């Protein structure tokens, strides 16, 4: 098929011979775009008659659907993993160290920045040590972030460059660093990259997003993640993929909240404002000790007073607030604070801010109901469950089978009216939205699954809603909506079954429920993106 630029201002382009995913016309085979807006949806013959002067594009049976939004990413860090040392696919310590040694030989004059190792996938389950890195990299400065980016292994040469590292909480001379020690180390290693190097990484990440049918990403930045300089540079980057930034720094009062937003350019003071860490690094804050480390309940990064002050300040200022919460103790601390703020200022004042919680892996039914009543958005990553869920996964190792199989309860959240926005947390998990949708529909705890249709909505409309777009059409293919869509090569489409207790609809083709690609366990390859368009402009393909 031949593609041209989408319709210029005042002219129209008519896509025909397609399979169009539209709630307004489930059997549609054609879509007209005029400028940056979808102007019509229907069938081929009617489209030709309605738009006789339009440029015709024959899609030869391709699938046209709303473009995706990734509601939680770290753009520069993702780019560094794409153009640098990616360890996310290694399955043994020896393989990891061999790859590090080869990279060190090929890149002799730079700090080595790597990402993605996960010792829970290795035969002995032991993390990397300082001595092993020193040997493999021949004494070079090395920073290797664990897959969850809440701990990192580092060589002696890099450790010696960081003032005060040995005195920081979370330091160990041989094992990966966590907490304050890791934040010091990461900031120092990040400083070794030039502005040009950071720009190259960003472009690689945003290009990758566009190639996967993603037109908008939510950057979750903060002082302890990428730093203010990188955050501002990213928001100023010119690229077809839209970037909405959230800054993770606590506000003391409403004036301070406004000052932080003005200073950073952020859409809200949310995202990765850490209340705790991650389960893989045993830094998520739990009510009960870890099953495989009974001496610890993880780490708390913010106390209750700071959490409540932040929520109160942002609510009074009308600014979106949010936190990174994974462990049940962290989740409880934030939800309790939300309740007190709602009592003080009223539920409508809280709900209109669109506060959001990232990850939200351990949440009870009562807590989910409270979040639904307060209009709090759950920005979640279904691929976490695909990677680490189930009775034999890392979650079960860390928490035991009972607790470990109750994480990421997507169906519970949806049933309680909690708006879902799906993301990848890239580079933690792959930035492939069809992987995300499939993971949500095939949860390793089946009762926590949502339907493919609901998952697709959370990966498209859900992301727009989470960033404050409430027009009712953005994220859909409906006349009058912005022309943000992707064209996919895929096999048969199916009407997926609903999830009892969440949504119900008929799977009869006569019911006019729009069909989606087959994402069942036995399905063929995932859809391949042929073209991505945002606001009428082609950004990929």
Task: Outline where the language-model segments fall.
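Divalent metal-binding segments
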Residues: 2-3, 10-255, 280-330, 354, ...
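Phosphate/diphosphate-binding loops
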Residues: 238-272, 354-361, 365, 393-418
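Short acidic/histidine-rich active-site segments
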Residues: 319-328, 380-382, 413-435, 480
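Glycine-enriched alpha-helix->loop->beta-strand junction motifs that scaffold or abut catalytic
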Residues: 264-266, 371-379, 416-419, 442
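Histidine/acidic-residue-rich catalytic or RNA/ligand-binding cores of hydrolases
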Residues: 156, 227-230, 331-339, 388-395, ...
């Amino acid at each position: 098929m031949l593609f041209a630029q989408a319709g210029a201002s005042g002219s129209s382009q008519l896509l025909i011979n397609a399979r169009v995913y539209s709630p307004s016309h489930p059997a549609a085979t054609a879509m007209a775009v005029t400028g940056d807006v979808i102007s019509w949806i229907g069938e081929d013959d009617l489209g030709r008659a309605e738009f006789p002067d339009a440029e015709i594009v024959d899609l030869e049976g391709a699938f046209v659907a709303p473009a995706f939004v990734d509601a939680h990413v770290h753009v520069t860090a993702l780019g560094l993993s794409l153009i640098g040392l990616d360890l996310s696919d290694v399955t043994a310590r020896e393989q990891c160290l061999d790859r590090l040694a080869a990279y060190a030989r090929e890149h002799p004059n730079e700090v080595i920045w790597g990402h993605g190792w996960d010792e829970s996938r290795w035969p002995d389950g032991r993390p990397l040590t300082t001595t092993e890195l020193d040997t493999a990299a021949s004494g070079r400065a090395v920073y290797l972030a664990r897959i969850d980016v809440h701990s990192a292994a580092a060589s002696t040469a890099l450790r010696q460059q960081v003032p005060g590292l040995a005195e920081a909480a979370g330091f160990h001379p041989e094992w990966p660093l966590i907490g304050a020690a890791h934040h010091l180390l990461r900031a120092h290693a990040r400083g070794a990259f030039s502005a040009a190097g950071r720009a190259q990484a960003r472009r690689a990440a945003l290009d990758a997003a566009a190639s996967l049918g993603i037109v908008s990403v939510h950057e979750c930045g903060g002082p302890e993640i990428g730093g203010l300089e990188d955050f501002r540079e990213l928001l100023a980057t010119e690229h077809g993929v839209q970037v909405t930034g959230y800054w993770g720094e606590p506000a003391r009062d409403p004036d301070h909240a406004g000052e932080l937003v003005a200073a950073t350019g952020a859409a809200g003071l949310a995202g990765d404002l850490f209340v705790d860490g991650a389960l893989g690094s045993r830094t998520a804050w739990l009510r009960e000790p870890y099953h495989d480390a009974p001496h610890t309940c993880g780490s708390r990064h913010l106390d209750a007073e700071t959490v409540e002050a932040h929520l109160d300040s942002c609510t009074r200022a009308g600014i979106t607030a949010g936190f990174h919460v994974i462990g049940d103790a962290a989740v409880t601390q934030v939800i309790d604070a939300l309740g007190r703020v709602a009592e003080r200022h009223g539920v409508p004042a809280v709900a209109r801010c669109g506060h959001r919680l990232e990850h939200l892996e351990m949440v009870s039914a009562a807590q989910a109901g409270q979040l639904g009543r307060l209009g709090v958005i759950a920005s979640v990553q279904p691929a976490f469950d695909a990677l680490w869920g189930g009775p034999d996964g890392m979650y079960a190792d860390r928490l035991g089978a009972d607790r470990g199989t109750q994480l990421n309860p997507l169906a519970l959240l949806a049933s309680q009216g909690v708006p879902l926005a799906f993301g990848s947390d890239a580079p933690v998990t792959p930035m492939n939205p069809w992987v995300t949708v499939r993971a949500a529909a095939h949860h390793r705890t089946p009762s926590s699954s949502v339907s493919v249709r609901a998952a697709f909505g959370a990966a498209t409309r859900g992301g727009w809603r989470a960033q404050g777009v409430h027009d009712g059409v953005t994220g859909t293919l409906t006349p009058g909506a912005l022309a943000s869509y992707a064209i996919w090569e895929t096999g048969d489409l199916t009407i997926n079954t609903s999830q009892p207790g969440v949504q119900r609809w008929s799977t009869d083709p006569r019911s006019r429920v729009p069909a989606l690609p087959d994402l069942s366990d036995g399905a063929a390859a995932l859809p391949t993106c042929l073209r991505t368009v945002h606001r009428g402009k082609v950004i990929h393909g």
